[in-house]
Curated annotation (Swiss-Prot):
This is Ig heavy chain V region MOO. Gene3D superfamilies: Immunoglobulins. It comes from Canis lupus familiaris. The keyword Transmembrane helix does not apply. This mu chain was isolated from a myeloma protein. The keyword Chaperone does not apply. InterPro entries: Ig-like_dom, Ig-like_dom_sf, Ig-like_fold, Ig_sub, Ig_V-set, IgHV. Residues 1-116 form the Ig-like domain. GO terms for molecular function: antigen binding.
């Protein structure tokens, strides 16, 4: 059974920072690309960042230069370092597998990030 468990969400003031974590199990983490996506209140899912199995990273324009995705294959853990947070970064953040023939796209339960003064 594929399981993704996010943590690290919190209430933070604008300009603050957070690090989200996602512990994966039930599949070969090191062989799969991973993503962070987010959902604003009342909105659809928005892609945030991807990291390939080899460690290449890709970012949405809205977070480029402020967020950093990384992975620790020894710990089966995905990270999202978030700096200079803005009110518009408020959302539920989900980690997700890269979906392909071998493993469909799975999501975690999400962790809530609220940016407010």
């Amino acid at each position: 059974e594929v399981k993704l468990v996010e943590s690290g969400g919190d209430l933070v003031k604008p300009g603050g920072s957070l690090r989200l974590s996602c512990v994966a199990s039930g599949f070969t983490f090191s062989s799969n690309g991973m993503s962070w996506v987010r959902q604003d209140p009342g909105e659809g899912l928005q892609w945030v960042a991807d990291i390939s199995s080899s460690g290449q990273t890709y970012y949405a324009d809205a977070v480029k230069g402020r967020f950093s995705i990384s992975r620790d294959n020894a710990k089966n853990t995905l990270y999202l370092q978030m700096e200079d947070l803005r009110v518009e970064d408020t959302a539920v953040y989900y980690c997700a597998t890269e979906g392909d023939i071998e493993i469909p796209r799975y999501f975690g339960q999400g962790t809530i990030v609220t940016v407010s003064s």
